[in-house]
A protein has these predicted regions:
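Hot-dog-fold acyl-thioester-processing enzymes
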Residues: 1-47, 108-110, 114-126
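HotDog/MaoC-like acyl-thioester-processing domains
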Residues: 61-62, 71-126
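Hydrophobic beta-strand-centered segment that forms part of the acyl-chain substrate-binding groove
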Residues: 34-73, 79, 94, 106
Length: 126
């Protein structure tokens, strides 16, 4: 099971030279997508326990459009291991406001994390 959120990256999110956005921006999107996945699976927002791994693979810039995917990797009694991927699907061409839809998405960030649901919210069906 998976959920995908898409979002425009405002230029105001860029804090570094080259119009770069910090990596925490993508991790916040992972949190939102992970919460959506947990609600879909268990009817509960869950609590995020932490990341086992995070890889920053390509820069995200102001003016990009990204999609954050949360995919269930495994399900325990109360724990949910989730694989995340942040992809850039549109890229700003220049500072004039022009942008293009990318022929192939650029994978910017990958991560794996664990969420936990309360006993009363845990379901047994996948």
């Amino acid at each position: 099971m998976k959920v995908v959120h898409q979002r425009y990256v405002a230029h105001s999110e860029a804090h570094y030279a080259g119009n770069l956005v910090d990596g925490a921006f993508g991790l916040k999107l992972f949190g939102d997508a992970g919460t959506h996945l947990a609600i879909t699976l268990d009817g509960h927002e869950s609590l995020f326990a932490g990341y086992a791994s995070v890889e920053f693979l390509a820069p995200v810039r102001g003016g990009d459009v990204v999609e954050a995917e949360a995919r269930l990797a495994s399900k325990g009694r109360r724990s949910r291991t989730v694989d995340f991927e942040l992809r850039i699907i549109c890229r700003s061409v220049d500072d004039s406001g022009r942008a293009e839809v990318l022929a192939e998405p650029i994978v910017a960030t990958r991560a794996r994390g664990t969420a936990v649901v309360p006993v009363e919210a845990a379901t047994t069906a996948l």
